[in-house]
């Protein structure tokens, strides 16, 4: 997973909750090309952050999905559903004007991981 591009932690534990900072489609320090590839890389980065914290997708209780083109919702949703399987945490999907480094999708997550 790429290092954060600004002054923040990729994830932070507060009691029994782990907050995964917004992840974009960075691989080896570069943004992957295209919304589908970015969505897959974003979810891989989220999974890696969760694993570092001792958890996985099944521990996620809430996700925020940001996209620069709400017209990509169905595509991003299908990739998200592949990753999460039967687990359906609460989620918001938000259209935004821009994301860091020209990303097309960003996802942050909150997981419940009792210590």
Language-model regions: role of each:
Residues 1-115:
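Short, polar/acidic, helix-capping and beta-turn segments at strand->helix junctions
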């Amino acid at each position: 997973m790429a290092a954060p591009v600004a002054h923040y932690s990729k994830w932070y534990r507060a009691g029994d909750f782990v907050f995964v900072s917004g992840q974009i489609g960075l691989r080896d320090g570069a943004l992957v090309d295209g919304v589908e590839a970015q969505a897959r890389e974003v979810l891989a980065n989220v999974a890696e952050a969760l694993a570092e914290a001792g958890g996985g997708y099944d521990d996620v209780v809430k996700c925020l999905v940001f996209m620069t083109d709400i017209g990509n919702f169905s595509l991003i949703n299908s990739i998200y559903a592949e990753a999460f399987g039967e687990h359906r945490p609460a989620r918001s999907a938000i259209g935004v004007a821009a994301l860091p480094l020209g990303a097309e999708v960003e996802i942050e997550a909150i997981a419940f991981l009792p210590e």
